[in-house]
Amino acid sequence: MGYYHRWEEFPEKTLHYLVDNPNAKGVKSRRISTDRIMVSKVTVKGGGKIPRHYHEAEQVMLIQKGRARVTTGDKKVHELRSGDIWVIPSNVLHGVEYIGDVEAFEIVSPPRVDTLIGYVIPHTFFEKAKKS
């Protein structure tokens, strides 16, 4: 038995933890989830930035259109273009800066429940700024 859908059936929205982030106002997502995996289509208009963060889930991103600058763990910046794949291991700090208009697919396992229902899991989130 299988299920069949179209992306347009799922609402496009800003993730709750990005709503107040002016650097991410152009980042929208549609997502579908099962018990074990979540797939998201990310659409970015005019660029956007998601600060470095971490979560238990493993994540894979495929850039379909556009470019993004990403960091994983060591803070070395890598630029991704259409057709590039970014693999993010569990509990590794990572961040992304979308350059202009971007379309990407993300696959996350296990699903990040916090992004589906709007709460933040305590061990999941943004890198704290260093005090000077």
Give residue ranges: language-model regions.
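A short, N-terminal "cap"/entry segment at the start of jelly-roll beta-barrel domains
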Residues: M1-R36, I121-S132
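Glycine- and acidic-residue-biased ligand/ion/polar-headgroup-sensing regions
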Residues: A57-A68, G73
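A cytosolic small-molecule/anion-sensing beta-strand core signal
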Residues: Q64-K65, R81, G100
